[in-house]
């Protein structure tokens, strides 16, 4: 499956998360979209399953932004145009597609991106969540609970 096919299965909200992730990368003057920007996009989107899960776990946009700034800081120049995903963020997207398949969903939603982020587990986003006292297993369990799915 090439990337065009993969993104065709993304819900409107999941596509919005990717656009918001790019905006967040630009806000921080980063010339890449990393897992931290995906997390910011998921929180900022505000209406999808992932946003609901993160809200249920007490994750707030202002706290995530502060943690990202503390951990990696800001870039030194304004970034314009399209920004690419880091290898780790690409892996999260691949895992999101896989999570959708495992759950037998015909679409890729915000919940799958969040599950991919948790499953990847080693990026800055995972570190940000853990620094906020949110364990990755909690995120997975809460996501499945909100979806009404058992493992």
Enumerate the language-model features and the residues they cover.
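Histone-fold recognition with a strong bias for associated Lys/Arg-rich disordered tails
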Residues: 1-151
């Amino acid at each position: 499956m090439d990337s065009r096919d993969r993104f065709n299965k993304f819900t409107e909200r999941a596509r919005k998360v990717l656009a918001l992730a790019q905006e967040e990368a630009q806000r921080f003057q980063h010339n890449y979209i990393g897992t931290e920007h995906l997390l910011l996009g998921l929180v900022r989107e505000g209406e999808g399953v992932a946003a609901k899960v993160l809200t249920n776990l007490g994750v707030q946009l202002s706290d995530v932004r502060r943690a990202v700034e503390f951990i990696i800081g800001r870039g030194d120049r304004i970034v314009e145009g399209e920004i690419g995903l880091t290898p780790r963020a690409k892996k999260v997207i691949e895992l999101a597609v896989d999570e959708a398949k495992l759950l037998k969903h015909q679409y890729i939603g915000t919940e799958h991106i969040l599950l991919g982020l948790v499953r990847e587990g080693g990026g800055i986003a995972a570190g940000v969540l853990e620094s906020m006292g949110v364990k990755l297993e909690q995120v997975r369990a809460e996501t499945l609970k909100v979806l009404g799915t058992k493992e």
